[in-house]
Amino acid sequence: MLIRSISGVRGLTFSYLTPDIALQYAKALHKLLPAGVIIAGRDSRPSGEDIIQAIIIELTRLGRTVLHCGIVPTPTVQFMVYRTEAVGGLIVTASHNPVEWNGLKFVGKDSTFFSEEDCNRLFELVDAENDLSDANEKGIVWPERNAIQKHVIACAGLKCIDLNLSLIHI
């Protein structure tokens, strides 16, 4: 069974959350978000690579530019949406669930997770099974290898963080 909630979707990998199912959510995300860049990232679950590759292939087939952050913490994808002014993001993760599970979390232009209303609109698009034809022009994938570093540097520079590096001995 695929579980849908305000947290996104979750399911046993390759039983309920397959690359084919994931690309249906990618199609719906493409249709829901305005034109622009989508940030993608994943956790370190072994199944994440197949799922995110299916998503990226589908989004670029539909003409999207995808900034692919690779294996990153979920908040880093949110930060990159904010930092790059992307139109949204997608994270392949099942959070606290066992390794045989995986899931999809969705991020809006404001760099926060989708609201209940946004999730319901996305689920309706998936259920409608709209087959979107290829875009006139293929999208591209930009690998982002420094997303975590950019996120850490931005956090360390916040005025509310008292970072005393003199305490660190290497």
Q: Predicted segments — roles?
A:
Residues 1-17:
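N-terminal amphipathic/basic leader segments beginning at the initiator methionine
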Residues 2, 168-170:
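Conserved small/polar residues in nucleotide/adenosyl-binding loops
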Residues 5, 17-21, 25, 51, ...:
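General structural feature for long, well-ordered alpha-helical segments within catalytic domains
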Residues 11, 26-30, 58, 89, ...:
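Glycine-centered structural positions embedded in regular secondary structure
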Residues 12, 104-167:
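Gly/Ser/Thr-enriched, mixed-charge loops and adjacent short helices
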Residues 25-38, 160-164:
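Glycine-rich phosphate/diphosphate-binding loops that line cofactor/substrate pockets in enzymes
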Residues 28-32, 80, 157-158, 170:
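A generic secondary-structure signal
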Residues 30, 36-109:
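Ferredoxin-reductase
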